[in-house]
Design a protein with these regions (language model features):
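Hydrophobic faces of well-ordered beta-strands that scaffold small-molecule active sites
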Residues: 3-7, 26-28, 47, 54-58, ...
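Glycine-enriched alpha-helix->loop->beta-strand junction motifs that scaffold or abut catalytic
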Residues: 20-26, 50-53, 85-89, 112-115, ...
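Structural motif corresponding to the early beta-alpha repeats
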Residues: 44-81
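Catalytic cores of alpha/beta
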Residues: 10-20, 66-79, 125-140, 161-166, ...
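C-terminal alpha-helical cap/extension of soluble enzyme domains
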Residues: 62, 86, 136, 168-225
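Glycine-rich phosphate-binding active-site loops on the catalytic face of alpha/beta enzymes
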Residues: 26-37, 81, 85-97, 142-155, ...
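N-terminal pre-domain/capping segments
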Residues: 1-26, 31-38
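Active-site-adjacent beta->alpha loops and helix N-cap segments on the catalytic face
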Residues: 13, 32-53, 70, 95-114, ...
Length: 225
């Protein structure tokens, strides 16, 4: 079975590019330049009207992934909005000052997300024990881990990602993301089958980055080779 492509977007034009490029799934965000924050209600509503599954970034503030009880309540509200729009799922992560995943906080979010899909985002790449996090994510109840293997890009962390895939043993999806493009797909998929790949599929235009439907098509073509 061929791999599928999830595209992260933060605008209406990004939604349109995903439709035109035939993305398999969307990660819905705002402020991708900050690593992705919770999207607006407007973008969630528009996403609910298209025929592509969407997972919603639940990240109320920029910076690190350490959160307060006030943040937790805001994240609960954003999860409720995701559910109200009948979107596919949510994407979140949380860490402690000691560099470990905040399992207690994540458990609260997981419980509040009952009935929809849950992705552990790249907060997992900020902790020292990225590989060991696979078992933690499984036990917490995540469906997917988005990761670059603890490195800046998937190509740098590919060996770690393949070890994470072996650890997962089909119990959770390991979804490589960061720096994926049409040129490196074959190397990423050699020796390991990742069910999902994650990319912004963006190009530079007038001092900014935009989601590009042609790049989506090129990555999907490379996947099918």
């Amino acid at each position: 079975m061929r791999s599928k492509l999830e595209v992260c977007i933060d605008s209406i034009s990004g939604l349109e590019a995903c439709i035109n490029g035939k993305a398999d799934r969307i990660e819905l965000c705002s402020s991708l330049e900050l690593g992705g924050l919770t999207p607006s209600d407007e973008l969630m509503e528009l996403a609910s009207e298209i025929n592509i599954p969407c997972r919603v970034m639940i990240r109320p503030k920029k910076g690190n992934f350490e959160y307060s009880s006030k943040d937790l309540q805001q994240m609960f509200r954003d999860i409720d909005k995701t559910r109200s729009y009948n979107l596919d799922g949510v994407v979140f992560g949380a860490t402690l000052l000691n560099g470990e995943l905040d399992q207690e906080f994540l458990d609260e979010l997981i419980r509040h997300s009952d009935g929809i899909k849950k992705t552990l985002h790249r907060a997992v790449d900020t902790i020292p024990k990225t590989i060991e996090a696979v078992e933690i994510a499984i036990n917490l109840g995540f469906d997917t881990i988005l990761s670059s293997g603890g490195y800046a890009t998937v190509m740098e962390g590919l060996a770690v990602l393949k070890e994470m895939q072996q650890r997962a043993s089909g119990r959770i999806e390991i979804m490589p993301g960061s720096g994926i493009n049409p040129q490196n797909i074959s190397e990423i998929l050699s020796d390991s089958h990742f069910t999902w790949l994650h990319s912004s599929c963006s190009i530079h235009r007038q001092n900014s980055k935009i989601t590009d439907s042609q790049t989506i098509k090129e990555i999907k073509t490379a996947i099918n080779v």
